[in-house]
């Protein structure tokens, strides 16, 4: 069986010493995906016909990558909105990372809160897995990295989304999953800590069809 192709979104930024805007992705992502048998397909932000592009590349799922905040870049916001519309229509697994999880939550009419807790910024911490299906391969607690200033709570959670992971110190939401679509998001960065749990959750989301039954 051939490896699955996974579309992955890109952050934008200015290249130093060049007068041009570029799409960018951390180099941590390709080796992690390669290790678990996934082929990354980069999704540019500047296309006018995004839906047509998504049809033609024929990927098996999507990763909404991290970096910056929802609302900072209208082009990227629009690209990821189109991806979510496409993945819902085609029932393709989608995995949101940090900003990507926030984009999923916003898409389903949720919101994010500016965190006042310094434990969320650049500090690893323990999270509790509160979903039985994910407990089967992640266990009841795992340690994750943390680079985000925004948080989600039960009051800010989007429609048809449910929490599957919460922090052990303030019960803010670190992981969400859609109730009836193959859509999941995490606030930590699996690519920055490519350990067993990071590989397991990605491989399960994209390669285990039974997980979404």
Where are the language model's segments positioned?
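Active-site-proximal beta-strand elements of phosphoester/diester hydrolases
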Residues: 184-188
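Short, structured loop/turn "capping" segments at alpha-beta junctions
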Residues: 113-115, 142-143
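Short, mixed charged/polar active-site loops
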Residues: 141, 173
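A glycine-rich beta-turn/hairpin centered on an aromatic-Pro dipeptide
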Residues: 146-149, 153
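Residues that recognize and position ribonucleotide moieties
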Residues: 125-127, 142-145
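N-terminal beta1-alpha1 cap of cysteine-dependent amidohydrolase-like domains
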Residues: 1-99, 106-113, 119-137, 153-170, ...
